[in-house]
């Protein structure tokens, strides 16, 4: 990469998590279990949506892409964290660090856009049920997914190229468990004002606006539900919306707090814990919150298991 001609260091050292040596094995087992849960949960959703024709709908198109994004998002950081905890080798080459940052931004941004698309899909389904199929046409759904991929690719590449132009002189210790963009900027010995402005401006477009759109969609959904005189339906809707919004708030809240509204006296431990929330916890919770609890997914799982009795049906 072009940044290697402008830097005097060839690798970085990831300090990882502030864990006591006697707690190392326990934490390793915990994060491994969480990572495997994320992988299996999201893979199950992708496979079920692929195999069951009843799930070939706009909502599940977005869900399958979200599951793929969550799977990749966790895989960008957690395997390296587990490797460092096991081998006690915190080094990561310069090029690998920028590559990790690129894919971290790519799949993190992709999740942000997909969450907006899913909120819009639910808004149309609940507020305009008679026009749902006309509004959420296959062409619109595919266009939303394709646009999400294009925008996130551009955004991730922009930040990576801006990072590659910076000089890193002496300090190569990253007090984090992955190559976090803000942590790298603190190590740079050249002017980072352009990077910081791009983070602030693009962050508003990629994070804040989608978050507000999601909140607006759910507000309209709740308003529409309250007009229906059904206490059972209202309780179920509030339960669903509440669980969705809790995960969405966890994802966006930690990102906004870390990158757009950083505290001057924020500790490394606090930043690491916040990062764990949206890199490890959210991707693990999404399959259970959005998919595995609902009737359609349970029905699809039963149908797929039944088909296994006759492999020619698959």
UniProtKB/Swiss-Prot annotation:
Extracellular compartment residues: 1-25, 80-100, 159-196, 261-272
Gene Ontology BP terms: signal transduction
Main location: membrane
Positions of transmembrane segments: 26-49, 58-79, 101-120, 140-158, 197-219, 237-260, 273-292
Keyword Membrane attached: yes
Positions of disulphide bridges: 97-189
Name used for this protein in its record: Olfactory receptor 1E5
Lineage: Eukaryota, Metazoa, Chordata, Craniata, Vertebrata
Gene: OR1E5
């Amino acid at each position: 990469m072009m940044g290697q001609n402008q830097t005097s260091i060839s690798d970085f050292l990831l300090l990882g998590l502030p864990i006591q040596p006697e707690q190392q094995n326990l934490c390793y087992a915990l994060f491994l279990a969480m990572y495997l849960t994320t992988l299996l949960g999201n893979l199950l959703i992708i496979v079920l949506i692929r195999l069951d024709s009843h799930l070939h709908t706009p909502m599940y198109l977005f869900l399958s892409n979200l599951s793929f994004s969550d799977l990749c998002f966790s895989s960008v950081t957690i395997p390296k964290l587990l490797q460092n905890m096991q081998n006690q080798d915190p080094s990561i080459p310069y090029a690998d660090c920028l590559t990790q940052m690129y894919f971290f931004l790519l799949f993190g941004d992709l999740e942000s856009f997909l969450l907006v698309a899913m909120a819009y899909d639910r808004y149309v389904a609940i507020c305009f049920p008679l026009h749902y199929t006309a509004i959420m046409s296959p062409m619109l759904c595919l266009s939303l997914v394709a646009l999400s991929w294009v925008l996130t690719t551009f955004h991730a590449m922009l930040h990576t190229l801006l990072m590659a132009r910076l000089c890193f002189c002496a300090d190569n210790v990253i007090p984090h468990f992955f190559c976090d963009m803000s942590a790298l900027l603190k190590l740079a010995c050249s002017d980072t004002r352009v990077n910081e402005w791009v983070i602030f401006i693009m962050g508003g477009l990629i994070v804040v606006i989608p978050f507000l759109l999601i909140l607006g969609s759910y507000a309209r959904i709740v308003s529409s539900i309250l007009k229906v005189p059904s206490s059972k339906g209202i309780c179920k809707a509030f339960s669903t919306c509440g669980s969705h919004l809790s995960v969405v708030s966890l994802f966006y809240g930690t990102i906004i707090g870390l990158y757009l509204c950083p505290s001057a006296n924020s500790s490394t431990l606090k930043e690491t814990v916040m990062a764990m929330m949206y890199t490890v916890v959210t991707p693990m919770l999404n399959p259970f919150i959005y998919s595995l609890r609902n009737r359609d997914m349970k029905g699809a799982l039963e149908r797929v298991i039944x088909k296994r009795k006759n492999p020619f049906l698959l």
